[in-house]
Amino acid sequence: MEFDELMQCPYDKNHMIRPSRFPYHLVKCRENNRAAAKILATCPYNARHRVPKQELDLHMASCEYRVTMEPISAAFSHQKVETSTWQSPPCEEVWETDEDPVSRPKPFILNDFTPSQPFNMSEGDGNMPYTGISSNYRPEVQPMNSVMQVKQNQPEPEPFTSSERNYDPRSKEPPNPKQPAVNGYKPATTNTNPWCRQTGGSRGAAPPKLGAKSSDEGPRNKEFPTPKANLMNEYVPVAANANPWCRQPGGSSAASEPLGVDSFDEWPCLGRQPWVRK
């Protein structure tokens, strides 16, 4: 950096500052040198120029940043400013005094307000006041004896029956109409359990199949006899889970004896006859 590019501080000649930092340095150095700041004056053409107050006029005459300025005319300096004649309107409210607690403000009433037109009137009668409802109307209080007499004259409501449990007041159909019989079967209720026996001996809501006339004659209600099992080698069949080594009633065992052994006494592999339940 060359020495010519630096600028000398007017408050301290030992300070050499770059031109880009010179305005910031002047503000900071002026605070540190208040005595020198009272002697120096600022040039009106360039704020970086600080000269003694006695030499300010000479500097302004020879400053390189001096520009031509138009002189102020005498007519312009003596021109009077026209004052406005506008005045604020008078205010009725007085803010200095306290509010009068006795006075009450008037209610706000709209001048163009018209009453609403009733539904059953024409457009010509819409401006007429509606006098059907009055604030002074009070319902007549009936004596106690007349109320009791009215209740006695009213018919008693019919008791609630189970046939009206599914009644819908919005529908025009009667509650739970009678359902026609299909093939001679009685219709069952909607929420009945098909596995619980109903009154009359019927077991399920669905009609039985195979041409039965009623639910009592259905195939599920009958008890079929157990078919006789075929005898194999003249032995009586026993239960599947019976102990094959215990003698069954009638002298037969559960396991088949293909070798012709009839009891444990004839079994050659058993050294001692076990105890057999009889």
Swiss-Prot record:
Q: Which organism is it from?
A: Xenopus laevis (African clawed frog)
Q: Give the GO cellular component terms, alphabetically.
A: cytoplasm
Q: Which family would the database say this protein is a member of? A: Belongs to the UPF0224 (FAM112) family.
- What InterPro entries is this protein classified in? TRM13/UPF0224_CHHC_Znf_dom, UPF0224_FAM112_RNA_Proc, Znf_C2H2_sf
From the broadest rank down, the organism's phylogenetic lineage runs: Eukaryota, Metazoa, Chordata, Craniata, Vertebrata
List, alphabetically, the Pfam families matched.
Answer: zf-U11-48K
Task: Give the residue ranges for region: Disordered.
Answer: 149-230, 249-278
Entry keyword set:
Cytoplasm, Developmental protein, Metal-binding, Repeat, Zinc, Zinc-finger
Q: What is this protein called in UniProt?
A: Protein D7
Question: What residues does Zn(2+) 1 bind to?
Answer: 9, 15, 25, 29
Per UniProt, the CHHC U11-48K-type Zn-finger stretches lie at 6-33, 40-67
